[in-house]
Structures are given as C-alpha cells and as structure tokens.
C-alpha cells in the first residue's frame, strides 16, 4: 500500500514563517508548502497506484480533505498520530464509515480507548498502528510490547509504523503480531527534504519486505508437534529402551532393569514410554542388552 499525507488547511496563515536556519529532521524547515500535493496530483497518484495493484491511502488533516477523499471513493483513511487525540476530528472521520488506520504516537492507552469508543459508536472499522513519533525513533523508545498489549485490550488488528532505517523494529513487531507495517521509503537518503534521512531506499525496503514475510512463515501455527523435517535427525539419534539385565517371564519390570541406547533399528520402544514400562509384567523371558518391544510387556 502507499500512503500520502494531505495537510491542506491545517496550518495558520503564518505557517511558513520559519527562519532558513531552522531545520527539523532532514534538510528543510518543516512544515513546508512546497511539499504539498494538489488534489489533482493526489488523484493522478491514486490512479497510478491502482494501475499497479497498490491500495492508495491518504492521511487527511482537516474535514475538507476527508470529504475530498470520501467523494473520490477512498477505501481506507489514515489518521496521523498528532490527530489521534483530536477527538472532534476523529468523530468526523468515523462518521464517514470508511475503514481507518489510526497511528498512536504520543498517546497513552486511555486516549486510545477514547478513540476506540468513537469508532465503535460510529460503527466504523478501524485499527491502531503502534508507533513512536520521533524521526528516527531510537530502539529503546520503540516499546514493541505495546503491540501485544493493545491486541489484548482492543481485540482488533494492530500494526506498526517504524520511523527509522533499522530492521529490528519492524521484524520485532511482526513477531509480536503486527498485521500492518508502515515504512517511509525514498529514492535516496541524500535527497533534500524532511524524512528522507529516516527512510529506507527501495532496495533496502525490498529486503525488509522479504525478511518480514519470512518472519511470518517462521512464526508458524503455534501448535507443537513432531515435524516431518525432524524425522531425519530422529532416525539417526533416537534412543530405544534396552534391558540392563535378564528378566524372567512374569516378573515386574523396575527402573533399575532399564537403560536407553541410540539405535536406528526399526521397532523398539521409545524412552517416552518409560512410565508405562516401569511396573509392567514381562510377557516372556527377556535378556540383557535386548531392545524392548511393545509385545514384551503388559
């Protein structure tokens, strides 16, 4: 998916009155009207994204932008972290009934619960993105455990927005159950403008996508069982229960009568049957170093 911010109308009339030497992260003063896209440019990007099979998601910053997006058939909206506690704006977005992704930088669980209630009351589908609103976000501030806790608290999908070039945040988020990942990408981190230095270049992004998908595969089902891939090693190293001494037919088998040997011989009783064997009755005469078979005891 591709996400584009749409900040029209969110600043005062003096929004660009920044001295040239005042810099935010990156290389330009931020915010900057030069970075904005017109409605026509957004529609052009939207159309292009659809032709290459991408969902196009925009972060509106005021009501008119919400109306523009809904009018043009937006399938999903994105609420920026700075507006997550702007409850009147949350209500407006939720009233449109368009599924919404809500970023949660700079918020706490109580504030998130208010937003959750707003969307639930409006019967508008939504999910949260866990994130840290710092560019780049330090590893120690990523606080990925929130993902698991938020899943438990709200019972909805939780994603992760990683504002850095590291891989650990994204891969850790996937391992903790994040369903959506947001990353900034750029043609080059040497380009002028905010956010470029905290973004991945496309080759790096492709590598991260591969690793994230591999992580999903590696997570598996959570069911623990004997796997087909383990059969080879099991066949080479598995142990069988072996008699340490002769045992007469009708005698009770004790733990002192038993040991285990590594053997690739077919049949035999595996060590996991130990508690079943101890106390059982020998059904025939058994000899020292004999591999115990299931028919030998009862």
Enumerate the language-model features and the residues they cover.
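Catalytic cores and adjacent flexible loops of soluble metabolic enzymes
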Residues: 1-298
């Amino acid at each position: 998916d591709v996400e584009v911010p749409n900040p029209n109308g969110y600043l005062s009339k003096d929004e660009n009155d920044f001295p040239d030497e005042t810099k935010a992260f990156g290389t330009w003063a931020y915010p900057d009207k030069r970075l904005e896209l017109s409605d026509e440019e957004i529609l052009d990007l939207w159309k292009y994204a659809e032709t290459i099979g991408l969902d196009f998601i925009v972060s509106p910053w005021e009501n008119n932008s919400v109306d523009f997006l809904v009018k043009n058939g937006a399938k999903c909206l994105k609420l920026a972290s700075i507006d997550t506690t702007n409850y009147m704006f949350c209500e407006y977005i939720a009233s449109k009934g368009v599924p919404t992704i809500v970023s949660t930088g700079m918020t706490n669980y109580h504030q998130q619960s208010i937003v959750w209630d707003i969307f639930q009351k409006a019967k508008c589908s939504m999910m949260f993105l866990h994130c840290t609103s710092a560019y780049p976000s330090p590893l120690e501030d990523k606080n990925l455990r929130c993902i698991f806790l938020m899943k438990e608290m709200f019972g909805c999908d939780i994603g992760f927005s990683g504002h850095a070039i590291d891989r650990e945040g994204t891969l850790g988020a996937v391992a903790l159950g994040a369903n959506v990942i947001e990353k900034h990408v750029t043609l080059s981190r040497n380009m002028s403008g905010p956010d470029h230095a905290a973004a991945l270049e496309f080759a790096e992004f492709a590598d991260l996508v591969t690793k994230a998908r591999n992580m999903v595969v590696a997570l598996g089902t959570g069911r623990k069982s004997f796997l087909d891939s383990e059969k080879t090693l099991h066949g080479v190293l598995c142990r069988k229960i072996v008699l340490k001494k002769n045992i007469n037919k009708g005698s009770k088998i004790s733990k002192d009568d038993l040991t285990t040997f590594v053997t690739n011989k077919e049949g035999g009783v595996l060590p996991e049957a130990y508690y079943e064997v101890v106390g059982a009755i020998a059904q025939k005469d058994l000899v020292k170093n004999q591999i115990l078979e299931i028919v030998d005891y009862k």
